[in-house]
Amino acid sequence: MRLPVLVLCVIGACSNAPKRDDARALPPAPSKPSGAEPMVAIETAQGEVNVTVEVVATRPKIERGLMFREHLPPDAGMLFLMGGETDHTFYMRNTLIPLDMIFITKDMTIAGIVERAEPRTETLRSVGAPSLYVLEVNGGWTAAHQVKSGAKVRFVRVTP
C-alpha cells in the first residue's frame, strides 16, 4: 500500500498541471515606475512640477517618515496625511539625508517651506502656520524648482 501512494506523490510532484494557487498568484512588483504612482503636482512660475510620492497616514508610519533612508530619487518624496490641520512640527532624528519640508493647507496651498533641514538633528521645524499635509523631498528641490509659499498644489492618485 505504501508503494502506490509514494508513486502517486512522485507523479503529482512532477506533473506539469497548474497548481491550484497559481491562479491567485500576484504579478511581480514592477521594477520601473508604471505611471500609476501617487503624485503631488505643484504650480510654479515655470509651470507645474510633479513629485512621485509614497503616502503615509498612520501614526507609526508618520513618526518613522524617511528615517534610515540613504537615498531618495530625484522628483520623489513622502506625503504625510496628518489627519488634522494644525501647526505641525518635524525633526530629523535618524534621517540620513537633507530634506525640504513643504507644509500644505486643507485648501491645497503651500503654507510654508523648511529648506535643507539638516540630517540627524532633533531641532523642531515648522512654518508657524496650520497645515494638513506635509511633503518631504530632497534638500534643495524646492529652490531648484522655484517652489514658493502660496503656490497651489493638487494630488494625483492620492485619497486624503
Protein language model features and the residues they cover:
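Sec-dependent signal peptide recognition
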Residues: 1-7
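C-terminal motif of bacterial Sec signal peptides marking the signal peptidase cleavage site
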Residues: 10-13
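Compact, glycine-rich, soluble single-domain proteins
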Residues: 15-160
